[in-house]
Amino acid sequence: MASNGSFSAQRNANAGTTMKRRNDNRGYGGGIGCYQEERNRYAPPQKRFRSQLQQQFRSGHNPLYHYGSNTNNNVSRVSSQSYNNYGVDVIASNSSFALPNNDSNTNNYQKPFVVYGNPNPQIVPLPLPYRKLDPLDSLPQWVPNSTPNYPVRSSNFVPNTPDFTNVQNPMNHSNMVSVVSQSMHQPIVLSKELTDLLSLLNNEKEKKTSEASNNDSLPVGLSFDNPSSLNVRHESVIKSLYSDMPRQCTSCGVRFKCQEEHSKHMDWHVRKNRSVKTTTRLGQQPKKSRGWLASASLWLCAPTGGGTVEVASFGGGEMQKKNEKDQVQKQHMVPADEDQKNCALCVEPFEEFFSHEADDWMYKDAVYLTKNGRIVHVKCMPEPRPAKDLREPSRVMSVTVPSVAKAILC
């Protein structure tokens, strides 16, 4: 059908007006207009399509659109379905779309108009402008310099190589030289005062580094020329004492590097404590280490060979008596035994106290009756009797016993 058909007058009459769109109730279940109030309240808002621009046709006239469900073999559908409430918009199949910038016959473009009936008209995309490329045959072809395959017998043969000696170098141009010279960093010119200051700072820095290297080379603790150096914190010494020896004994504070040495040291502490407890239980005093420093009398008597001289205490006789009493009390105490809480002779309980020196609970004024026997009080202990000499003959003592008869007579 031609573009100037019978419907052109109706289309032109409605060109400046907006036609009312029908209610779209597809998929709701009711007919057109059913439950319109509920649908407008609960249904989600529908997307409204904006009017699109119609493209130009080769004929130069507006396309003919039909409103209705007309099935014609000479027309092609653009955008619709048979079950919707919209009219079927068709376009004549014999009219073809024209591509812009390719039709040299006409340059007049149609004005945009409102599409009637179809809310989503189909738009034909426009191609991008292009430039016609040259064919491959017109491109330059690179032909390398080929050397002959036959062997060269002449010693004066020179291969066919390009000569670039006569070609001008663009970098040697005067303008290029000026640009390169401007882009290069120019040397910084410093004043004399600033140069002297920088040299002085560099000399001081070098001096400090040399002193630090000399101090590191000397052993720690052997340089006493500068008293302030004794207060310097030596990180190497601290690291060797703490970081290099992380394991420390909780009893004496000795540090070790590995776990094996630490375990051996702890075993030695256990054996020492057991031996001390055994000796105190047997009534023997544990052996104490000698004093760190000798007394003045020992120093005076040592050159003459007089031996050790006991030094009198500063407190006089009272202090000496108190010390002797304390020593006696220390001798008369034994480790506490849960099986023997009462004296074996008087059956009275012992006085128990904790000794910080022995690090154990002890019985006060108590001794062993025998070496491994019962525990008794010191006051309950029988006095020792002198042993008789069996080699001497026993002497018969004469005892005068008054006769019974004489006593009776008197």
Swiss-Prot record:
One of its GO terms (cellular component) is nucleus. It is found in: Nucleus. GO terms for molecular function: mRNA binding; RNA polymerase II complex binding; zinc ion binding. It comes from the Eukaryota. Residues 1-17 have a biased composition (Polar residues). Residues 191-214 form a coiled coil. GO terms for biological process: mRNA 3'-end processing; termination of RNA polymerase II transcription. Its main location: nucleus. It holds the Pfam family zf_PCFS4. Residues 1-32 are annotated as: Disordered. Keywords: Coiled coil, Metal-binding, Nucleus, Zinc, Zinc-finger. A zinc finger (C2H2-type) spans 247-269. InterPro entries: PCF11-like, PCFS4-like, Znf_C2H2_type. PANTHER family: POLYADENYLATION AND CLEAVAGE FACTOR HOMOLOG 1-RELATED, PRE-MRNA CLEAVAGE COMPLEX II. Forms a complex with cleavage and polyadenylation specificity factor (CPSF) subunits CSTF77, CLPS3, PCFS4 and PCFS1. This is Polyadenylation and cleavage factor homolog 5. The gene is PCFS5.
